[in-house]
C-alpha cells in the first residue's frame, strides 16, 4: 500500500435514534443512524412497521387500500 494516501482509521461512536450507541472503527469520528440492531424488528422479534418517509400511507393511497 502507498503511504499517506489512505484516510485515517479512527474509533467511531455510532448513535441510534432509539438512544443506543456503540463504538466501532471508521473514517468518521461519529455516525448517526435511524435504526440499529437494538430497535430493528428483525433483531427484536417484534412486528412493527418501520416507516421513515410515509411510504406505507403513500402505497395505500396509490392503490386505494384504505
Swiss-Prot record:
UniProt KW RNA-binding keyword = yes
Q: Which residues bind Zn(2+)?
A: 16, 18, 36, 39
Q: Please share the entry's free-text remark on the cofactor.
A: Binds 1 zinc ion per subunit.
Q: Which domain of life is it from?
A: Bacteria
Q: Which UniProt keywords apply?
A: Metal-binding, Ribonucleoprotein, Ribosomal protein, RNA-binding, rRNA-binding, Zinc
- Matching Pfam families: Ribosomal_L31
Quaternary structure, per UniProt, is: Part of the 50S ribosomal subunit.
What's its job? Binds the 23S rRNA.
Q: Which family does it belong to?
A: Belongs to the bacterial ribosomal protein bL31 family. Type A subfamily.
Return the protein name: Large ribosomal subunit protein bL31
What is the organism field in this record?
A: Campylobacter lari (strain RM2100 / D67 / ATCC BAA-1060)
Give the taxonomic lineage as stored in the record: Bacteria, Pseudomonadati, Campylobacterota, Epsilonproteobacteria, Campylobacterales
Amino acid at each position: 500500500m502507498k503511504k499517506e494516501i489512505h484516510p485515517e482509521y479512527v474509533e467511531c461512536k455510532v448513535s441510534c435514534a432509539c438512544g443506543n450507541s456503540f463504538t466501532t472503527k471508521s473514517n468518521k469520528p461519529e455516525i448517526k443512524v435511524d435504526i440499529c440492531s437494538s430497535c430493528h424488528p428483525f433483531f427484536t422479534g417484534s412486528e412493527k412497521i418501520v416507516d421513515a418517509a410515509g411510504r406505507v400511507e403513500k402505497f395505500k393511497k396509490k392503490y386505494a387500500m384504505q
